[in-house]
């Protein structure tokens, strides 16, 4: 059991200090008397159940003095102090005029996360199998929402909207680890370490407008969910062009070879407010897995490492796509009128029109990668000892040897450094080496 009494000057004296506590409890089941027979037979070597619960706080609440109203002098369009007329002859008031520049919220407070975890650790059959399982859940509440991201009616009269603690979000999932180690009578050893993680979050409450459709609200979707215009192939003929829904912007510039953008809400007009819909997942994988497999025998050894992810969407927004430069190689092949094929809308002498991208740059980011493979032989006896060395190892390995994915390239991320430079593609390498130990 532990606790912390935390304070932050971002909040008013009434909300500045909060006590957060947590605790954990474990039970070594394998040490109980009723487990003795299983331990003696080396069926169960160790089995432990554990759980924890606790709260932590977050004071990332925008401006430092958000609980205090910020007043400013009234100025004209040129930035000069402006005093209001006070008589029929137009003479100005001798007093300085102020207005509420930022409306405060004195009730701003710590955002809180209630973290819960329950799991178990195990070892079976004389250490042949071992691993763990964990189920976790984080309930976040009083999440900070800035005034700029709040929903206010059109008749709201102030220049700014006060910040608020209102958001709620749930994050949950589980982790599985399995380890295998087996040595045969002839000294041959097999071993494996494998992990799998599932993690999902859902926004339970945000300051969404009450009367908008559910697909336009953040509530019910994951943090970081992609919203996009939905494209349904290309406009291939003039008949298809004339039958497409009108577009709020640049409707007169739509051409054959552009994407057919779906009028998601069916009102006859494609617009940014009503026709961008949830698409795919977030940029963080919901499912991740990895495994390392090894084998050893009489100086020979081999191992392979593989990993992958699913439940993820990648927005391939490379620097070469800036300003709609549709002629770059990275963008893919243009639509052509001969067979209607291609990946990119028909090229123009000017920049791309609005809405044309659709889901063009949103890809299923799932992948399976064979990360490393190594084969080696190690001498530890005989002639190597006579030469005064303890061991000599020859090895051949490779990195990034195999990849299965629907992504258009093999990059860990879109950008490689601050400033927006494109990330260098993942490199395949082969190495041969000698390791000599004295």
What does each of the following model-derived ranges do?
Residues 64-66, 70-79, 181-283, 399, ...:
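Conserved small-residue
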Residues 34-111, 128-169:
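Solvent-exposed loop/turn elements at secondary-structure boundaries
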Residues 2-7, 92-101, 147-161, 173, ...:
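Flexible, solvent-exposed coil segments and beta strand-coil junctions
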Residues 16-22, 66-73, 148-158, 207-217, ...:
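Flexible, surface-exposed loop regions and adjacent strand-edge segments
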Residues 1-11, 16-31, 113-116, 124-131, ...:
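Surface-exposed extracellular loop regions of Gram-negative outer-membrane beta-barrel proteins
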Residues 30-47, 125-128, 183-190, 203-208, ...:
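Short loop/turn motifs that connect adjacent beta-strands in outer-membrane beta-barrel proteins
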Residues 254, 309-398:
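Extracytoplasmic gating/loop element in the C-terminal half of outer-membrane beta-barrel translocons
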